[in-house]
Design a protein with these regions (language model features):
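Active-site phosphate/pyrophosphate- and oxyanion-stabilizing loops and adjacent acidic/basic residues
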Residues: 24, 89, 121
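Structural beta-alpha unit
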Residues: 1, 71-101
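Small/aliphatic-rich secondary-structure junction motif
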Residues: 1-50, 78, 126
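Gly/Ser-rich helix-loop-strand patches that form or flank binding pockets
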Residues: 97-137
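Short, surface-exposed alpha-helical segments at coil->helix boundaries
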Residues: 53-64
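Generic structural signal for helix capping and beta-alpha/helix-loop junctions
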Residues: 44, 87, 110-112
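Short, flexible/disordered intra-domain loops and linkers
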Residues: 46-55, 112
Length: 137
């Protein structure tokens, strides 16, 4: 399979640098278009009514800084910043425009894994394109 359009679902820049780096390597190997997708959930930037936690609302400039820091090969990366109420559904919708979706996978505890799928598993179960899963420690 030859990939022409690759998308990375980018969540948290500290942990996803490894995922971004892998996506750049694959895109370069196939000379493919690379798009970094980040979904700001609708409540991002505002305190949660439950616990007061404020989820960070990323800007295109912040994501561009992350790409510049990780992208030592200066491979062209398009940044797509979207807002949605559900991250999984938004990633699935945007992934319809690509051949390969690159995702990070965080280990879940036994209890969490036995009661539900991780976000990346939920996404992969509904994808219409190939997926590359990068383990994040």
């Amino acid at each position: 399979m030859e990939y022409k359009k690759i998308m990375i679902a980018f969540e948290e820049h500290d942990q996803d640098n490894k995922v971004l780096s892998a996506a750049i390597d694959v895109a370069q190997r196939y000379n493919a278009e690379l798009t970094l997708l980040h979904i700001n959930e609708r409540g991002a930037g505002y305190p949660s009514p439950v616990d007061g936690h404020i989820e960070h609302r990323y800007t295109e400039e912040e994501l561009s800084e992350v790409v510049t820091k990780v992208n030592t090969k200066n491979y062209p990366v398009t940044i797509l910043l979207a807002k949605a109420s559900g991250v999984g559904d938004a990633v699935i919708e945007h992934s319809k425009a690509c051949d390969l979706l690159v995702l990070g996978h965080r280990h879940m505890s036994f209890l969490a894994a036995s009661t539900s799928d991780s976000m990346d598993e939920e996404i992969v179960n509904q994808l219409q394109c190939h997926a590359l899963i990068i383990p994040i420690t």
